[in-house]
Amino acid sequence: MQRHPMTKEGADALQEELQHLKKVERPAVSNAIAEAREHGDLKENAEYHAAREQQGLMEARIKQIESLLGSVQIIDVTKLNPNGKVVFGSTVTILNVDTEEEVTYKIVGEEEADIKHNKISVNSPIARALIAKEEGEEITVKAPSGNIEYEIVEIQYV
């Protein structure tokens, strides 16, 4: 079985979601199904069919999370000795050399990547260019619009 890297924060969030699904959502859906059953004929009972569909989706998500948690390798960046280099779990501030625009990214596993929250996958082009680099170094990222030059401004291990 292939192990997938994940930050401790990402694994904790998945564990929390799993507990919520099992302890809150699952009983609520079971109650909704029982309540819909009381309305009689199940063939034409839209509430019943909707609740069963919701149950199926929820159970699939529970299985997905359990499978994920069973195959992750949790990496706690605070326990690493990165020697000032960008590593998995680092939070990196970079400066676009052309536009002077600064952006901060946290390098995380595939399953926890979320660009809206500036969490990028370790397999993304930017993260691959950043890994093992130090503050002050410049990197080149190949983008559809051409190469983009960045300078590493700051590396944090939180």
From Swiss-Prot:
Disulfide bonds: none annotated. PROSITE patterns: GREAB_1, GREAB_2. One of its GO terms (biological process) is DNA-templated transcription elongation. GO terms for molecular function: DNA binding; RNA polymerase binding. It holds the Pfam family GreA_GreB_N. Keywords: DNA-binding, Transcription, Transcription regulation. Belongs to the GreA/GreB family. NCBIfam families: greA, PRK00226.1-2, PRK00226.1-4, PRK00226.1-5. Necessary for efficient RNA polymerase transcription elongation past template-encoded arresting sites. The arresting sites in DNA have the property of trapping a certain fraction of elongating RNA polymerases that pass through, resulting in locked ternary complexes. Cleavage of the nascent transcript by cleavage factors such as GreA or GreB allows the resumption of elongation from the new 3'terminus. GreA releases sequences of 2 to 3 nucleotides. HAMAP family: GreA_GreB. This is Transcription elongation factor GreA. It comes from Hydrogenovibrio crunogenus (strain DSM 25203 / XCL-2) (Thiomicrospira crunogena).
